[in-house]
């Protein structure tokens, strides 16, 4: 059970996990903007897989903070 209630916007109800997904997406974009210029992606075998794993890890950390 999350700390946040279901939020209703213009008659559409959004569960709390929706906002956790959006927050983790914003943090993912920031982390990715930092990692790309550093050249970390030159050492990554599969960039799409790395991005997916990074997003999943960030989402897990964000969801653990709010539960």
Curated annotation (Swiss-Prot):
Coarse class of the protein's main subcellular location: membrane
Pfam families: DUF1656
Induction: Positively coregulated with aaeA and aaeB by AaeR.
Keyword Cell membrane applies: yes
Cell location: Cell membrane
Superkingdom: Bacteria
Name the record gives this protein: Protein AaeX
Annotated source species: Escherichia coli (strain 55989 / EAEC)
Lineage: Bacteria, Pseudomonadati, Pseudomonadota, Gammaproteobacteria, Enterobacterales
């Amino acid at each position: 059970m999350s700390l946040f209630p279901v939020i209703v916007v213009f008659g559409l109800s959004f569960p709390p996990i929706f906002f956790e997904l959006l927050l983790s997406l914003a943090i993912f974009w920031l982390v990715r903007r930092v990692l790309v210029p550093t050249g970390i992606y030159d050492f990554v075998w599969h960039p799409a897989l790395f991005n997916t794993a990074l997003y999943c890890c960030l989402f897990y950390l964000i969801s653990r903070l709010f539960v």
